[in-house]
């Protein structure tokens, strides 16, 4: 039955599985690093902004502008533009390793801004109360900002993770491997539409799973 519906896919099962694993590798490495960096920069943005608990206009201005600039660069351009960084840090500019750096650079600015918005939702009264009790900025960050923003951070993480799935597919267009590379190499270049449709279906399943997990985590 499947041999008739998706004949080109059935003869490429090992390559499809390899592509899925490569996608998971890219998402795992870049997602983990982007989460840590994005959370850090998001916190820096919220505490150094005007009337923040550690207000510092120069720091906020520089970081805000860098994030805006990086977010404005299309990912398909960002990949070749960061090729020298991939070679310097990862030792290669192709394959899964070569995609990690551009994926991080493409994800961190977006996630940082999402974290800033999530932390901005915290009730100012709670922050003032913590300051009145003598809490240090670090204590306020962990006990108030992060603790009170867990549902919002979960939503931001879900949105970013879904965006990252799309970026990994796009990275495949420039030879990074994964599902995007599988769809382009076999589906598009060899005119095998069933390969493209199966790839789309797998990506939709990944997005659905990520959204379902995110919805559960974001429930207060």
Where are these regions (language model features)?
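Glycine-rich helix-loop "coupling/hinge" segments at transmembrane-helix boundaries
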Residues: 167-197, 201-202
């Amino acid at each position: 039955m499947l041999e008739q519906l998706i004949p080109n896919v059935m003869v490429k099962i090992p390559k499809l599985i390899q592509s899925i694993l490569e996608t998971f590798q890219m998402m795992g490495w870049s997602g983990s690093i982007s989460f840590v960096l994005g959370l850090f920069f998001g916190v820096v943005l919220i505490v150094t902004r005007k009337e923040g608990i550690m207000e510092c206009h120069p720091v906020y201005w520089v970081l805000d502008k860098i994030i805006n600039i990086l977010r404005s660069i299309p990912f398909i351009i960002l990949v070749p533009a960061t090729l020298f960084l991939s070679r310097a840090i990862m030792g290669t500019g192709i394959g899964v390793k070569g995609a990690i750096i551009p994926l991080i650079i493409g994800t961190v600015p977006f996630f940082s801004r999402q974290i800033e918005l999530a932390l901005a939702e915290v009730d100012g009264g709670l922050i003032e109360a913590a300051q009145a009790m003598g809490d240090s900025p670090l204590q306020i960050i962990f006990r108030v900002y992060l603790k009170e923003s867990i549902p919002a951070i979960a939503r931001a993480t879900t949105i970013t993770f879904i965006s990252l799935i799309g970026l990994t597919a796009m990275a495949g267009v420039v030879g990074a491997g994964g599902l995007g590379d599988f769809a382009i190499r076999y589906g598009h270049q060899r005119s095998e539409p069933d390969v493209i449709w199966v790839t789309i279906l797998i990506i939709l399943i990944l997005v659905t799973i990520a959204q379902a997990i995110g919805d559960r985590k974001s429930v207060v």
